[in-house]
């Protein structure tokens, strides 16, 4: 937390225990070699789609999260801006504005928003 007196409540927790090549998580045991960037991005897509589906009461939504590295930022030595996420969303029966509003209620989206390029359709 930042400077000064602040109040905070825990809204979630993740746990992982690595032991002998196996990672034990709240979702079960996973072979550590099976954990990849793609699996983490899939979990982010799951969080985003759930947030939109629940807030907008829609049943058909597709979310794709892609990780990109900005080579210009890398070459410029701007390591804080090298990684970017592209989030592509398709939702039937909802406007772009409604979807963006629903995403702002997702804590992961809010934390990562400065690094996200949102695409519609």
Protein language model annotation of sequence segments:
Residues 1-43, 50-121:
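Extended beta-strand/beta-hairpin segments
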């Amino acid at each position: 937390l930042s400077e000064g007196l602040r109040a905070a409540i825990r809204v979630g927790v993740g746990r992982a225990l690595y032991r002998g090549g196996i990672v034990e998580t709240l979702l079960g045991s996973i072979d550590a070699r099976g954990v990849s960037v793609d699996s983490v991005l899939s979990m982010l897509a799951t969080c985003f789609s759930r947030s939109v589906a629940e807030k907008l009461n829609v049943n058909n939504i597709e979310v794709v999260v892609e990780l990109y590295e900005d080579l210009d930022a890398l070459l410029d030595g701007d390591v804080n801006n090298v990684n970017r996420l592209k989030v592509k969303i398709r939702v039937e029966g909802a406007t772009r504005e409604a979807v963006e509003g629903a995403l702002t209620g997702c804590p992961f989206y809010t934390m990562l928003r400065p690094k996200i390029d949102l695409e519609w359709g």
